[in-house]
């Protein structure tokens, strides 16, 4: 496994394009995230092909179901050889514990999703959830930590307070990373790599600023250089 802090979101709608794009990257400089659309389309064979290219794979399926179902899904996902999988912290402690126990003795890391980065205070109010996104994220992150998970997904804006509360060994995975001149797209809580690293982020998920770049490898190298400078 490499020690890169970057996870490239492989958000493509067909397997061929995804694999061709991945082949343009350097597996020493990043890991790869495969989400629902691409995995539903291409299945486990895609994971195997990405691993043959040398990539550690984050299988981003955000499991959220009854404990037994999530535990079984986590076990199967781990058998694919992926580096990391995730579940929704809103599934509660029983579900989180079941997922954690399903991976005991296995190499696959387990993290929890707190709040989606597209959600803001108005979205929470609409769902009847009181409190700011920061408060809800902290509550869910600490629940995941108590249940033995390796880390959580959170925005870079919440990373500083979470790092202080959760300690140095708890992974903070931050999507919504953009350079200062990138489009915000549909992410409400975004940050630059420098801000994310200084706030305590462990890994940065970067999608469109790399996948839509005219020169993806150059963009990846630029982001890596910024991270190294921030460390």
Swiss-Prot record:
Keywords: Decarboxylase, Lyase, Pyrimidine biosynthesis. Pfam families: OMPdecase (PF00215). It catalyses: orotidine 5'-phosphate + H(+) = UMP + CO2. One of its GO terms (molecular function) is orotidine-5'-phosphate decarboxylase activity. Pathway: Pyrimidine metabolism; UMP biosynthesis via de novo pathway; UMP from orotate: step 2/2. SMART domains: OMPdecase (SM00934). Substrate binds at residues 11, 33, 60-69, 117, 178, 187, 207-208. It comes from the Bacteria. GO terms for cellular component: cytosol. InterPro entries: Aldolase_TIM (IPR013785), OMPdecase (IPR014732), OMPdecase_AS (IPR018089), OMPdecase_bac (IPR047596), OMPdeCOase_dom (IPR001754), RibuloseP-bd_barrel (IPR011060). PROSITE patterns: OMPDECASE (PS00156). The active site is at residue 62. Coiled coil: none annotated. Its EC number is 4.1.1.23. GO terms for biological process: 'de novo' pyrimidine nucleobase biosynthetic process; 'de novo' UMP biosynthetic process. Catalyzes the decarboxylation of orotidine 5'-monophosphate (OMP) to uridine 5'-monophosphate (UMP). Belongs to the OMP decarboxylase family. Type 1 subfamily. Homodimer. This is Orotidine 5'-phosphate decarboxylase. It comes from Nitrosomonas eutropha (strain DSM 101675 / C91 / Nm57).
């Amino acid at each position: 496994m490499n020690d890169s802090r970057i996870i490239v979101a492989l958000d493509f709608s067909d397997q061929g394009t995804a694999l061709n794009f991945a082949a343009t990257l350097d597996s020493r400089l990043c890991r790869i995230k495969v989400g629902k659309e691409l995995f539903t389309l291409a299945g486990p064979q895609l994971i195997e092909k990405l691993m043959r290219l040398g990539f550690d794979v984050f299988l981003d399926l955000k499991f959220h179901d009854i404990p037994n179902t999530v535990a079984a899904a986590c076990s199967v996902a781990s058998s694919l050889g992926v580096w990391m999988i995730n579940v929704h912290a809103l599934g509660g402690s029983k579900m989180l514990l079941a997922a954690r126990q399903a991976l005991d003795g296995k190499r696959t890391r387990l993290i929890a999703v707190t709040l989606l980065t597209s959600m803001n205070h108005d979205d929470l109010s609409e769902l009847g959830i009181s409190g700011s996104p920061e408060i809800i994220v902290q509550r869910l992150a600490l629940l995941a930590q108590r249940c033995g998970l390796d880390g959580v997904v959170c925005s870079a804006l919440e990373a500083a307070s979470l790092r202080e509360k959760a300690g140095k060994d708890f992974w903070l995975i931050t999507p919504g990373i953009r350079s200062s001149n990138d489009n915000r797209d549909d992410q409400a809580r975004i940050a630059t790599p420098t801000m994310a690293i200084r706030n305590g982020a462990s890994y940065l998920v970067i999608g469109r600023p790399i996948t839509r770049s005219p020169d993806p490898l150059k963009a990846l190298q630029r982001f890596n250089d910024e991270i190294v400078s921030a460390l």
